[in-house]
């Protein structure tokens, strides 16, 4: 049943108010569930300004396959400025840790500074309100360094 199609006009005002709150909660839960299980939905939820292209859908499908275990290895080759680093080095680790809080991820980049930068971005995302609406994963208080952090789970 679609909650938005239910006629609530004849209900008492306090019940209408509760029903409207339930609609909002239901919509938020649907967004949360989709973002937990679909990488591109996660991206769109935490990055509202994101502009989606066909190549994003393709790589997101591969990331979903990687997360589900359908594939175990993935090499990503894309031209510069096509969101490869944002997806693979920042958003994917945050999404994967949300799905599997005990997961260990090694970030390999051509400089240590770049790996720390991506680690810092992922850490800030995991500490954000937007992320908390999707995943219950939190970081340990004593391990919040940009280059090395652990979840509390």
Question: Can you annotate each of these PLM segments?
Answer:
Residues 95-104, 127-131:
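Post-Walker A helix-loop "phosphate-sensing" segment adjacent to the P-loop in P-loop NTPases
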Residues 60-64, 86-98:
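Contiguous, well-ordered alpha-helical segments that form the cores/surfaces of helical PPI scaffolds
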Residues 70-92:
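Walker A/P-loop
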Residues 1-72:
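N-terminal accessory segments
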Residues 70, 101-102, 152-153:
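Short, well-ordered loop/turn elements at secondary-structure boundaries
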Residues 77-80, 104-110:
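Hydrophobic/aromatic-rich structural module bridging two neighboring secondary-structure elements via a short loop
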Residues 56, 85-90, 112-115:
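Short alpha-helical patches at coil-to-helix transitions and adjacent helical residues
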Residues 108-153:
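Conserved nucleotide-state-sensing and coupling region of NTP-binding domains
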């Amino acid at each position: 049943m679609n909650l938005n199609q239910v006629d609530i006009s004849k209900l008492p005002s306090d019940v209408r108010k509760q029903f409207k709150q339930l609609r909002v909660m239901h919509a938020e839960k649907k967004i949360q569930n989709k973002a937990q299980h679909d990488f591109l939905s996660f991206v769109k939820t935490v990055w509202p300004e994101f502009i989606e292209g066909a190549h994003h859908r393709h790589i997101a499908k591969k990331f979903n396959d990687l997360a589900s275990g359908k594939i175990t290895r993935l090499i990503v080759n894309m031209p510069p400025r096509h969101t490869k680093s944002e997806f693979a080095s920042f958003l994917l680790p945050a999404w994967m840790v949300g799905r599997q809080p005990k997961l260990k991820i090694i970030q390999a980049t051509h400089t240590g500074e770049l790996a720390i930068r991506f680690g810092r971005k992922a850490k800030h995302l995991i500490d954000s309100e937007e992320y908390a609406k999707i995943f219950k994963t939190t970081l340990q208080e004593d391990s919040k360094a940009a280059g090395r952090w652990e979840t509390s789970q």
